[in-house]
Amino acid sequence: MALASELMDRRTLLAGLASGCVVALAGCQTNPSTGRQQLLLVSEGDLAQLSATTWRQTLEQERRVTDAAVVRRVSGVGQKLADRSGLARMPWEFAVFDSDQINAFVLPGGKVGVYRGILNLFENDDQLATVIGHEIGHVRGRHAAERVSQQIAAQVGLTVAQVALQQNEVRYAREIAGALGAGVTFGVILPFSRTQEYEADRLGVDIMAAGGYDPRQAVAFWDRMTQANAQRRQPLEFMSTHPSDGNRIAALNQYVVQRGYRA
């Protein structure tokens, strides 16, 4: 009896995972910028429309830097990179937010936000181009669409598994479904996110070079970021969506050397 129940549990879980796999296989496409196959169930255009509202709300709610020279600097570097990114037709916008956060972000559709806190780390425009190039790299890499698609595919499989578990009255159905969810998060979704971060670094370095900036300054910037983070508690890489600074610097340096970039 126990063996039969265990086999039923396994079949139920496998059925849910199989459903997610069918969705995943149906949506796989090759990204021409990277040569990597991606799960793309939604388009960048659809996400751009959804993100437009978020961008407008952010501009209305967040305080922005009013120093015209700072705004011109960020917008100038950003537009120069965007023009050489292969995505020049996209309606790019660049905003500088008045916050101590050491961060920057990009929304689908070419909306880039840079925080005042991170500007203090830049020694030159090449390092500013490192960050903006990285954000543009996420767009060129179709990472937002891929991330959403991964979540859709994972949720399809999880939903089927949860329903089947409940209908078959499997013992500890809620606990098993919860564990399955954690497994998908740490085993599938987060590693892809780290892959996207490394990919955005590489694409960003290429965009920097195309825009006339020194790609070697990407390594210098992350060295400075490491020093800034020295007093902060960092999560273990396995539990994080971002590569650790040390691994990031090593990967960037290897790529810059491999590409033979010079100032």
Question: What are the residue ranges of the model-derived segments?
Answer:
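A Zn2+-metalloprotease active-site environment signal
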Residues: A2-A263
